[in-house]
């Protein structure tokens, strides 16, 4: 009988004045996951950042190429025949697309390299000094780079 009274006292001690048992502590719930694909919040954020970066790079490339094409097609100095394009226009458009790709890659590789840009965002370095040091340093080169041999 004494064991039953001790158990009863333990059970009563867990009850608050309203009579609700507050001794049960539910296990921690995991972060919100989409059960079908098992995607958590960080994965969604990373995919969003990658999608925005891809959009910016693609938009910059296509916008620069579009501007070059408009300049080439509206050049007053060139007289074109209605059936075709002038070779100078074709060369300018081809070089425009090439320089557009080069400009986009240069902007996102040298200027917006994630590790150095995050150092700037968190106040650990100046962006200008990081960009200048990138031009001088060869820490971006890979093993097969002809520049670093």
Swiss-Prot record:
GO MF annotations in UniProt: water channel activity
Subcellular location: Endoplasmic reticulum membrane; Cell membrane
Biological processes per GO annotation: transmembrane transport; water transport
Cytoplasmic compartment segments: 1-47, 111-149
Keywords attached to this entry: Cell membrane, Endoplasmic reticulum, Membrane, Repeat, Transmembrane, Transmembrane helix, Transport
Induction data: During exponential phase in rich medium and repressed in minimum medium, hyper-osmolar medium or in sporulating conditions.
Coiled coil: none
Entry membrane topology: Multi-pass membrane protein
Function: Water channel required to facilitate the transport of water across membranes. Involved in freeze tolerance, osmotolerance and cell flocculation in liquid cultures. Is non-functional in most laboratory strains.
Cystine residue pairs: none
Annotated protein name in UniProt: Aquaporin-like protein 2
Positions on the Extracellular side per record topology: 69-89
Regions that span the bilayer: 48-68, 90-110
GO CC, any one term: cytosol
Entry superkingdom: Eukaryota
Spans annotated as Disordered: 1-35
This protein's domain notes: Aquaporins contain two tandem repeats each containing three membrane-spanning domains and a pore-forming loop with the signature motif Asn-Pro-Ala (NPA).
Assigned protein family: Belongs to the MIP/aquaporin (TC 1.A.8) family.
């Amino acid at each position: 009988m004494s064991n039953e009274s001790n158990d009863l006292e333990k059970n009563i001690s867990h009850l608050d004045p309203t009579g609700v048992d507050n001794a049960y502590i539910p296990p921690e719930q995991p972060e919100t996951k989409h059960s079908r694909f098992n995607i958590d919040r960080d994965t969604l954020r990373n995919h969003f950042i990658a999608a925005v970066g891809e959009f910016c790079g693609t938009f910059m490339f296509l916008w620069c190429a579009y501007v070059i094409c408009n300049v080439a097609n509206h050049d007053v100095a060139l007289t074109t025949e209605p059936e075709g394009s002038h070779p100078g226009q074709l060369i300018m458009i081809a070089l425009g697309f090439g320089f557009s790709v080069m400009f986009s890659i240069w902007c996102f590789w040298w200027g917006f390299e994630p590790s150095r840009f995050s150092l700037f965002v968190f106040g650990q370095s100046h962006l200008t000094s990081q960009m200048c040091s990138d031009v001088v340093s060869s820490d971006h080169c890979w093993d097969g780079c002809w520049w670093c041999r």
